Amino acid sequence: MSIKEWFEDRRKITGLLKNSVERDSKDANETEKNKNLSIDYAKINRLWAQCDNCESLLYIRFLRENQSVCKECGYYLQMNSSDRIELPIDRDTWHPMDEDMYTLDVLQFHSENEPSHSDHLDSEDESYKDHISFYQIETGLTDAIQTGIGQLNGIPIALGVMDFKFMGGSMGSVVGEKITRLIERATAESLPVIMVCASGGARMQEGSFSLMQMAKIASALYIHQKDKKLLYISILTSPTTGGVTASFGMLGDIIIAEPKAYIAFAGKRVIEQTLGQKVIEDFQVTEHLFGHGLFDLIVSRNLLKGVLSELFRLYGLPRK
């Protein structure tokens, strides 16, 4: 090889290296750009929400001021438990109960079929504890319900609010225990109980421990309603299904439902497969069920506090 040929080879190699470095630099810039875009999308998600019905883009602050009702079509979006507590409770009167109660994985439940929520875990490596931890971080709650004592237009009440954003509002041992303790305290202090239901039913990861909560809560309510003659109002929101519908959801002295809520025990597909026949559309929606006598009232969110206050007045409950 001549000296001239050697220099030409060096120039070719240098050019290839330069192109490679430029490509790597460009790829790195694209990656950083995409990363920045994802951060911007995260910020957008905290500021805007999309209506599940009409797909309108809704500004979160205005949506909360409108009690999570779409201003375009009137559709009721899901509310978290903290926002729901603010609806009926007077300002600075809320005193939460059992905030530090959390679930123990007594069954050592492990599912390979559940989707993974953690970046560093594959679904087959993720346990029930991992799922609980994920939702605790996402919602800021220890489990799928908040309970406490507050005042509604000056009337002391015991209030429990389920949160569907925490594992679909499923009822496990902690949810059942918190509701039972709330009812027992209300019974001891002669307070009315209001339960806001939003749940997919019993929590499968806790097996019979979850199913046992249905009987435990019903037993506490029996003493509250039958023995002490105290008022219990159940408010059903979308969705209320499964073991919650089959227990305390339908045990209220007065049962209130939100408009167009999905309320059921089993889903439509399960019913059709069991009965071997088709069922009509929307047969598990509030308005259809109300027409068949399952509820006492259908109340919109903006009227709820006034309606509850009037019911308490008719019941003769004293202001504090």
Swiss-Prot record:
Annotated coiled-coil positions are none
Give the EC number: 2.1.3.15
ATP-binding: is it a keyword of this entry?
A: yes
Specify the CoA carboxyltransferase N-terminal domain's residue ranges.
Answer: 47-320
The catalytic activity, as recorded, is: N(6)-carboxybiotinyl-L-lysyl-[protein] + acetyl-CoA = N(6)-biotinyl-L-lysyl-[protein] + malonyl-CoA
- Which pathway does the record list? Lipid metabolism; malonyl-CoA biosynthesis; malonyl-CoA from acetyl-CoA: step 1/1
Q: Where in the cell is it found?
A: Plastid, Chloroplast stroma
The record's Gene Ontology cellular component field reads: acetyl-CoA carboxylase complex; chloroplast stroma
Say yes or no: keyword Thylakoid present.
Answer: no
Q: Which InterPro entries match?
A: AcCoA_carboxyl_beta, Acetyl_CoA_COase_Trfase_b_su, ClpP/crotonase-like_dom_sf, COA_CT_N
Zinc finger (C4-type) residue numbers: 51-73
Query: Quaternary arrangement and interactors, per the entry?
Result: Acetyl-CoA carboxylase is a heterohexamer composed of biotin carboxyl carrier protein, biotin carboxylase and 2 subunits each of ACCase subunit alpha and ACCase plastid-coded subunit beta (accD).
Name the record gives this protein: Acetyl-coenzyme A carboxylase carboxyl transferase subunit beta, chloroplastic
The gene it comes from is: accD
